[in-house]
């Protein structure tokens, strides 16, 4: 197809204006996790491992619900582009019902995490810390998801700056709170890894109150009328539409995260050094992943608005410009990892064995930067088109059909080669992400071949 390079600067500018605040917001959120790992590492590798194993349970479930709620963003963006802002408040109110529907079972899981930890043969030396950490995180998940719902509205309105400011403030608060609760300052008992959970719960509640205050007082959003009603009965029709779009996103997010998170659980019997080095490489890769992830979210917002304006050909051009820009970011990230793979682990641990393992794993992380960037931007494009079911099918096949079983085989068994430990999972990460990126781009090409009138009619039915 004609990529219309003369439009690239204009389209890149649209995307960058949204990407920068989204990136800062994502980076701040990821920075909280990084601060937890780094500060817990000053206590012991056992505390780092406790957080790593806890996060392998917490984040897949949290991100599943986040994925479902993310269906609200392209819907709001589409309604905003179609000049139907009066329909937006209803979507957000129904989003609150979804939050409560999911949050109660999540709390039950977190309060009974010992069943999962026992099943995975997690070493007793940090299993109890993981249980206590998750019990505290159960307190903070309610405000975290309520904040996501309000953030999705602002993102859909192409207004990501409030979330950027609030999340950055959350990061600034998280670090001193970690210091107080991890090391036991100002009369607070020393909690180690569990202190990270206490700090995170406090920060989550604070961020929700700030986001609520912004949405309540922001004059440009008054016409939406979100707070004209303080209570609205659940609408089966609207909730079904959100779930039809959001559940595939949620399950796709869950399957991808599980590819990474279950690796920590399967590696935990190999000891603290292996888990800590694996977590070091994973945390570094996750920080760099924030750029294409933010770009993918920005692409969803722009495409939703453009499709709401019925500009189907313009949406095609923006899609491919976004993919190309994602590759550029990935190449830069890969080069940085290769150049500094021996230095990066020093920020996480002082153990020489953990440093050596992490340095090796980071080279695998460099390899998969391009396919990982392509798949996340492609995900954003398909969400903008509200074409989410194929994303689920691709991710389940690539990450659960290939990634998890073959990662386990390479890491823990001698069925194919001698056990590769963490490197076995990282090799499969590269394979799974490469396959997923190719299949998702194929899905983009497929939906863009649909006649414009047919595509718009489909989008109107599910708005």
UniProtKB/Swiss-Prot annotation:
This is Probable multidrug resistance protein NorM. Belongs to the multi antimicrobial extrusion (MATE) (TC 2.A.66.1) family. It is a multi-pass membrane protein. The keyword Cell membrane applies. One of its GO terms (cellular component) is plasma membrane. The chain crosses the membrane at residues 20-42, 57-79, 96-118, 133-150, 162-184, 194-216, 245-267, 287-306, 318-340, 355-377, 390-412, 422-444. Multidrug efflux pump. Keywords: Antiport, Cell inner membrane, Cell membrane, Ion transport, Membrane, Transmembrane, Transmembrane helix, Transport. It is found in: Cell inner membrane. It holds the Pfam family MatE. GO terms for molecular function: antiporter activity; xenobiotic transmembrane transporter activity. InterPro entries: MATE_fam, MATE_MdtK, MdtK-like. The gene is norM.
């Amino acid at each position: 197809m004609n990529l219309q390079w003369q439009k690239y600067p204009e389209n890149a500018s649209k995307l960058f204006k949204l990407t920068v605040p989204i990136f800062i917001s994502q980076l701040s959120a990821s920075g909280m996790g990084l601060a937890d790992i780094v500060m817990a590492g000053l206590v012991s590798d056992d505390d780092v491992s406790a957080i790593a194993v806890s996060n392998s349970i917490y984040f897949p479930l949290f991100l599943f619900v986040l994925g479902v709620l993310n269906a609200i963003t392209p819907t709001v963006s589409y309604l905003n582009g179609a000049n139907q802002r009066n329909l937006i408040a209803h979507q957000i109110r129904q989003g609150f019902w979804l939050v409560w529907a999911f949050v109660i079972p999540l709390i039950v899981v977190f309060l009974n995490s010992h069943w999962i930890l026992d099943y995975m043969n997690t070493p007793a030396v940090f299993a109890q810390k993981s249980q206590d950490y998750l019990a505290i995180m159960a307190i903070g998940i309610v405000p975290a998801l309520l904040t996501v719902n309000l953030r999705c509205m602002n993102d859909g309105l192409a207004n990501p700056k409030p979330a950027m400011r609030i999340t950055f403030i959350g990061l600034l608060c998280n670090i001193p709170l970690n210091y107080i609760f991890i090391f036991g300052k100002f009369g607070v008992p020393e909690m180690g890894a569990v202190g990270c959970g206490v700090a995170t719960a406090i920060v989550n509640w604070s961020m929700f109150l700030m986001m609520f205050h912004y949405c309540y007082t922001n004059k440009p959003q008054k016409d939406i009328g979100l707070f004209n009603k303080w209570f609205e009965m659940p609408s089966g029709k609207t909730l079904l539409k959100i779930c039809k779009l959001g559940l595939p996103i949620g399950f796709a997010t869950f399957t991808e995260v599980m590819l990474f998170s279950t690796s920590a659980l399967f590696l935990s019997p190999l000891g603290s050094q292996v888990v800590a080095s694996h977590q070091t490489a994973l945390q570094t890769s996750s920080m760099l992943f924030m750029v294409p992830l933010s770009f993918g979210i920005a692409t969803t917002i722009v495409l939703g608005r453009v499709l709401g304006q019925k500009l189907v050909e313009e949406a095609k051009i923006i899609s491919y410009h976004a993919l190309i820009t994602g590759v550029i970011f990935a190449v830069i990230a890969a080069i940085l990892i290769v150049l500094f793979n021996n230095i990066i682990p020093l920020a996480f641990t002082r153990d020489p064995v953990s440093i050596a393992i992490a340095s090796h794993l980071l080279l695998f992380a460099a390899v998969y930067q391009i396919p990982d960037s392509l798949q996340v931007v492609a995900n954003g494009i398909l969400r903008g088109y509200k074409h989410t079911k194929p994303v689920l099918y691709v991710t389940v096949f690539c990450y659960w059909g290939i990634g998890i079983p073959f990662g386990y085989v390479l890491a823990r068994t001698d069925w194919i080669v001698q056990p590769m430990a963490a490197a076995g999972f990282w090799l499969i990460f590269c394979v799974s992400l490469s396959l997923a990126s190719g299949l998702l781009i194929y899905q983009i090409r497929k939906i863009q071949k649909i006649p414009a009138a047919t595509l718009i009619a489909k989008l109107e039915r599910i708005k």
